[in-house]
């Protein structure tokens, strides 16, 4: 029987090297517990997106093992892999909505993993799941847009539809890859508030890549700094100074804004 205090996400000596030799991740060892709200910060190209995409196995790692609630997603196949992924919700910078479909239909895709393909192809969702989708839209204040086409919404509204889709999926984990990168400051804070709501009210573990240090400070409970594919800082947000953020981004060399190779 698995220990009750096992990490929700565990990376053991994980590395990712791309075909062209670029190092995406190098010797990552990381535990994230159930219910944490973790923000990952670092320069563009530091490895933040590679980290999240590896956790959900959107890309395979070159070395090491990744466990989701005690189960290896690295070695999982077929039904086992699908069941693990069902517990992981993804939120992307580009929203990943079907633009010509209604808001409701987009939110219902959060339930796809619970159905055989032929049922979702013909939109044969149960009344219970349609109710779940509607209630999720209520939580993000978009119930009045239920039959609106996704491409008629603003960027902020589209991202909130993506959050409602994740809520309908009811995962244990949410991975948010730069969820506010294309949004204005006010809308960004609203999206982060919605993610915090999923974390606090539903107990979902959230790992979010953020380019905004201010948003990271406001919403994160724990901060992980990534530079050149390695974790260079891991600590409580309440104990993390501005000097630490400066070091994560500048590498202690004083060259602010320097891009990764």
UniProtKB/Swiss-Prot annotation:
Enzyme class: translocase
Family per record: Belongs to the ABC transporter superfamily. Phosphonates importer (TC 3.A.1.9.1) family.
Domain ABC transporter: 9-253
Coiled-coil portions: none
Ligand binding (ATP): 42-49
Assembly behavior: The complex is composed of two ATP-binding proteins (PhnC), two transmembrane proteins (PhnE) and a solute-binding protein (PhnD).
Molecular function, one GO term: ATP hydrolysis activity
UniProt-annotated location(s): Cell membrane
GO cellular component, one term: plasma membrane
Function: Part of the ABC transporter complex PhnCDE involved in phosphonates import. Responsible for energy coupling to the transport system.
InterPro entries: AAA+_ATPase, ABC_transporter-like_ATP-bd, ABC_transporter-like_CS, ABC_transpr_PhnC, MetN_ABC_transporter-like, P-loop_NTPase
UniProt-listed Enzyme Commission number(s): 7.3.2.2
SMART domains: AAA (SM00382)
Catalytic activity line of the entry: phosphonate(out) + ATP + H2O = phosphonate(in) + ADP + phosphate + H(+)
Predominant location: membrane
Keywords: ATP-binding, Cell membrane, Membrane, Nucleotide-binding, Phosphonate transport, Translocase, Transport
Name of the protein in its database record: Phosphonates import ATP-binding protein PhnC
UniProt membrane topology term: Peripheral membrane protein
